[in-house]
């Protein structure tokens, strides 16, 4: 038997102590439940999940997805409604999407409006619904024929070819006006909570291809001598115009963007304001998207960089990039775009026995400017690879979460609820029978002051029913109707209810002891 001296014993004790401290801190970071956190998921049309299904089958599939996502703590859906100058909603401006019915311009058989339906279904579940559009892509390789009212048929001169893509020419003011017209139509007709754009601006670089806009640059350089600066300004103008439009039409709608995960590559190989320690495609230089400028100018309300790579990936390390966005792009709420399937395929460098979800969430929740995440993609969460959804349900989203505050839009809390009481409900068509907490919706004259949701807290006998801005330990539900179904024996418990407005400013509490 090997004998260990005092030095070896001390060394092993030190290692064990360090491991226990690490494990404690690691678990604390993982299990901490923020009271406010964006927990989104993208529902895309471009993966073909809608094709070959009837509207009834689609509604059933999406309803099941929403139920599962809600159970996993997701509180916002980013729903793709414009993929290539088309519409997954009833529009007089653009044709129905081929991603919905298989043929561009063909309406759903029963006249279904997916966006109107999605808004209603999200709100039933107290989830936000953000309309997700692409402002520049007009046609992809998979679209063999366009509808007679598609922009490629009516105004092909406003598009340019890049590889197998047709792109709205960002240099043309008429295209910016048209995009804003499409957005205004959505805002005026649908009760969306957000307007969302993804990572497609100028096209991703393709070998052997060049952007055919030199004639536009020579004709109207607007004082720029660099075509790269001019291209960035073309996009800047649109982003500012969309911001101004949203604030004018529906000021409570959040305007957010999910850019590619790399802003710029650092010239010295270290994270700095100039860029991250990465070696990949760049927003600034390749897509002509100056993300940092947009948040500094306050043209966007949130950012979701798509950091789909893994910890330890040499070209674009997740850990390096999350730190960079936290350090240099935190002027607006910052959420991290997570790739579910990639996360569970790669082993954690610190613990090869598990995948990377634990370390990614520990890092995300340890940084002060990161206020949530968004899952790519919703169906992947539902499918639960590597128990990803199970971990959301049991660990990271164990408690509900309010949305991060946006005081530049509105910071006035709604009035508190009235007449909080116990109510016994008999069987009805629209309400499950049972014993409810019920209350009266507070009065409001302005849209921004109206209560749209309610937070319900529960305190055990002997606990002081006090709310704090950061404590979610007693938050049991966020509901859209002025009632909450009580489960089991709640005798002796104290319930607290607050009203939430569109920006989820929280009213003063009202409590009742059972």
Language-model segment annotations:
Residues 60-87, 189-190, 293, 299:
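Catalytic domains of carbohydrate-active enzymes, especially glycoside hydrolases
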Residues 387, 391-448, 504-514:
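Pro/Thr/Ser/Gly-rich low-complexity, intrinsically disordered linker/stalk tracts
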Residues 485-507:
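Beta-strand-rich modules
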Residues 87-102, 137-163, 199-222, 268-279:
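Aromatic- and acidic-residue-enriched segments that line the glycan-binding/catalytic groove
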Residues 288-314, 330-409:
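Substrate-binding cleft of secreted/luminal carbohydrate-active enzymes
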Residues 36, 42-44, 48-60, 131, ...:
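Active-site-adjacent "subsite" loops/lids of carbohydrate-active enzymes
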Residues 442-470, 509:
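Solvent-exposed loop/turn segments flanking beta-strands in beta-repeat/beta-sandwich domains
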Residues 174-182, 188-277, 281-307, 312-331, ...:
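Active-site neighborhood of glycoside hydrolase catalytic domains
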């Amino acid at each position: 038997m090997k004998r260990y001296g005092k030095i070896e014993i001390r060394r092993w004790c030190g290692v064990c102590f360090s491991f226990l401290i690490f494990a404690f801190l690691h678990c604390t970071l993982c299990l901490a439940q923020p009271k406010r956190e964006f927990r989104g998921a993208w529902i895309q049309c471009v993966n073909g999940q809608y094709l070959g299904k009837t509207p009834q089958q689609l509604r059933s599939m999406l309803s099941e997805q929403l139920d599962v996502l809600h159970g996993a703590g997701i509180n916002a859906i980013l729903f793709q409604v414009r993929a290539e100058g088309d519409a997954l909603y009833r529009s007089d401006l653009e044709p129905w999407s081929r991603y919905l019915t298989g043929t561009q311009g063909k309406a759903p058989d029963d006249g279904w409006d997916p966006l109107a339906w999605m808004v209603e279904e999200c709100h039933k579940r107290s989830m936000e619904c953000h309309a997700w559009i692409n402002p520049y892509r007009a046609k992809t390789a998979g679209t063999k024929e366009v509808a007679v009212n598609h922009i490629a048929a009516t105004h092909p001169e406003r598009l340019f070819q890049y590889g197998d893509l047709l792109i709205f020419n960002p240099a043309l003011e008429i295209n910016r006006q048209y995009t804003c017209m499409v957005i205004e139509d959505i805002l005026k007709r649908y009760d969306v909570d957000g307007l969302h754009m993804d990572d497609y601006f100028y096209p991703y670089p393709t070998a052997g291809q060049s952007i055919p806009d030199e004639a536009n640059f020579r004709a109207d350089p607007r004082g720029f001598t660099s075509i790269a600066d001019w291209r960035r300004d073309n996009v800047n103008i649109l982003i500012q115009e969309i911001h101004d439009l949203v604030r004018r039409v529906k000021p409570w709608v959040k305007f957010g963007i999910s850019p590619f995960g790399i802003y710029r590559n650092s010239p010295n190989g270290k994270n700095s304001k100039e860029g991250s320690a990465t070696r990949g495609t760049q927003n600034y230089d390749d897509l002509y998207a100056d993300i940092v400028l947009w948040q500094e100018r306050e043209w966007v309300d949130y950012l979701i960089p798509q950091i789909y790579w893994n910890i330890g990936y040499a070209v674009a390390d997740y850990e390096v990039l999350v730190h960079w966005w936290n350090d240099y792009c935190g002027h607006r709420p910052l959420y991290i775009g997570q790739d579910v399937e990639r996360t569970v395929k790669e082993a954690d460098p610190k613990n090869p026995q598990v995948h990377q979800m634990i370390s990614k969430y520990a890092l995300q929740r340890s940084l002060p400017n990161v206020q949530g995440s968004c899952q790519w993609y919703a169906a992947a969460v539902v499918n639960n690879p590597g128990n990803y959804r199970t971990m959301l349900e049991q660990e990271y989203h164990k408690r509900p979460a309010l949305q991060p505050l946006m005081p530049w839009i509105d910071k006035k809390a709604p009035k508190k609820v009235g007449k909080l009481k116990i109510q016994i409900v008999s069987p009805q068509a629209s309400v499950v029978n049972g014993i409810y907490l019920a209350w009266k919706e507070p009065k409001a004259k302005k849209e921004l002051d109206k209560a749209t949701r309610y937070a319900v807290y529960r305190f055990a006998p002997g606990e002081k029913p006090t709310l704090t801005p950061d404590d979610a330990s007693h938050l049991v539900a966020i509901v859209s109707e002025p009632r909450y179904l009580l489960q089991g024996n709640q005798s002796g418990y104290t319930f607290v209810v607050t009203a939430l407005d569109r920006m989820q400013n929280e009213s003063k509490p009202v409590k009742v002891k059972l």
